[in-house]
Each structure stands twice: as structure tokens, then as C-alpha cells.
């Protein structure tokens, strides 16, 4: 029997720094599909991306400031305690073991990440442990480069919210979330040039960035 009352999701990323483009779409998503909790999980050594500019401790502090008044979010630092790359499949398998076999669990990604998903380490095991919730990105198609990958997507894709609650894992749900044209790269560039980005991230996070002399 599936526990239908507590759909939870992990939201991973570098968060260098965390900004409204991270937080607002997920808050809207939670209301749309009935997420009870979103676990923010900062990466330590992202296998596919350059090293973060802020330290792990600084990124964690910024996240704590950003979600201090947002009960939807909690923070999980397990990947920061590893000395190895942050493999999503490993983390999600651990999470499933902790939560038991019946609880509906999900992993939130962007549509851009879905297109490269088959290149992820042990990607084929991920849907054994969680659902995938895909947030739309402008300009990205819903077609995979390889025919076999397209068949995999078509087999698991659903537009039925209830399927996220009625089974513990195994579906890919395409969410209708709004797009916020904000990125950590843009914020870092604007800060480096001494330009304002107050509308892009929480005030407490921006104050901390200035106190620490980050991204300048």
C-alpha cells in the first residue's frame, strides 16, 4: 500500500548563490501538485559542472538564510560531507532506503537536464527509487537525441498529478511552472561589475554576499 499523504521531493543544485529562480518555481510547483516537503540538497563536487565559487559552508549559509521563513523547505547536507562526486543515483537510493518502499518520493529537475539525463551516472536506476518532476524551460524540446531514450521517456511520461501520489516511484511528470529569467551566472556577473541584483535573490542572501565579499 502506498502512503498517499506525504509526497516529498529533493531539489539538488550548486546554489552558487541561491536565488528566486530556484525558489519561486518550486514553491508554485508544491502548490500545484501537493508537495508536503522539498529537501534542498547542495552539491559538493558536481560531476558535470565547474567548481562553485563560494565554499560549501558559504553556500549552506546562504541557503539557510533563503529558506528561514519558508516551512516548505528543509536542507540536507549529506552530499557536502562526501569526498567523492555528487552522484544523484547514489543519493536517491540512500533516500529511498531511509524512507521505506511505500512513500511517494520525487526528484525535481529542469527540462534542460532531462535532455541529458541518459548521460547521468546509473541513470537507469533513478526511476526505481523516485519520480522525476520536470520543470519546463523555454526553448527546450521534449524530444531526446536518441530513439531509445525517447522510448524510455514516452514509457514513463505522465500528465496525471495523481500518479505522483498513487505510486512510490517510476513516472516522469512535466510540470507547468513559470520561468524566471534569473541565473546564478547572471548574478555573479552583475555583482562582479558592481551592478544591482536585489530583485533576483533574498535580501538576507545579498547582505551575506556583500559581507563575505563574494563574487566580486
Curated annotation (Swiss-Prot):
TM spans (from-to): none
A Gene Ontology biological process term: NAD biosynthetic process
Record-stated family: Belongs to the NadD family.
Pathway: Cofactor biosynthesis; NAD(+) biosynthesis; deamido-NAD(+) from nicotinate D-ribonucleotide: step 1/1
EC number: 2.7.7.18
Annotated Pfam families: CTP_transf_like
Catalysed reactions listed for this entry: nicotinate beta-D-ribonucleotide + ATP + H(+) = deamido-NAD(+) + diphosphate
Top-level enzyme category: transferase
NCBIfam families: cyt_tran_rel, nicotinate (nicotinamide) nucleotide adenylyltransferase, PRK00071.1-1
Full protein name: Probable nicotinate-nucleotide adenylyltransferase
Top-rank taxon, per record: Bacteria
Keyword annotations of the record: ATP-binding, NAD, Nucleotide-binding, Nucleotidyltransferase, Pyridine nucleotide biosynthesis, Transferase
GO molecular function, one term: ATP binding
HAMAP family assigned to the protein according to its UniProt record, in alphabetical order: NaMN_adenylyltr
Lineage, broadest ranks: Bacteria, Pseudomonadati, Pseudomonadota, Gammaproteobacteria, Enterobacterales
Protein function: Catalyzes the reversible adenylation of nicotinate mononucleotide (NaMN) to nicotinic acid adenine dinucleotide (NaAD).
Annotated source species: Klebsiella pneumoniae subsp. pneumoniae (strain ATCC 700721 / MGH 78578)
